[in-house]
């Protein structure tokens, strides 16, 4: 009976869907989390501590609550943002469709990018500033410093955050259940 379930085409399609969504979510979350970590740690942006706290909010809420909120905002026929664009700018159809692979992945990115953000922030804050100073004294430019020093030192944190996101996204059932069922997108 177990083998019969594993060999059904629906099970294989659910596995493919899970891998597609997890891959898209991992790539998106890694890019967003790394960018915001760099922004918070390497710039003189105001309200850095507020941003750090704000990025931790998704950990305090169940993911399906955020999914329902995004569904209310971006639903193709009744979402507030789509209705705003249709009524204000006269679009003939919805601007955003949250019931696609990209929509599901975008919602998961909003929820999961703090995994990478926290890891990369820690790595960037612990980086020895004398490495950058030595490279500057040696005549290296910002691009060279980033490519030869910063990225190699931060890469383990980026990869560990990406691995966490990939595993979590593969096991994350709620978002796909709320958004994907209407389009026949199921996951394992």
Give residue spans per PLM region.
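Membrane-water interface segments at the C-terminal ends of transmembrane alpha-helices
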Residues: 1, 7-125, 153-174, 178
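Short hydrophobic, aromatic-rich alpha-helical segments embedded in or entering the lipid bilayer
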Residues: 1-4, 183-188
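Membrane-helix boundary and inter-helical linker elements of multi-pass secondary transporters
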Residues: 41, 137-138
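Short coil/turn motifs that cap or connect alpha-helices
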Residues: 46, 140-141
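Helix-turn-helix DNA-binding elements, focusing on the entry/boundary residues of the two helices
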Residues: 131
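Glycine/proline-centered hinge or cleavage motifs at structural transition points of membrane proteins
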Residues: 138-139, 152
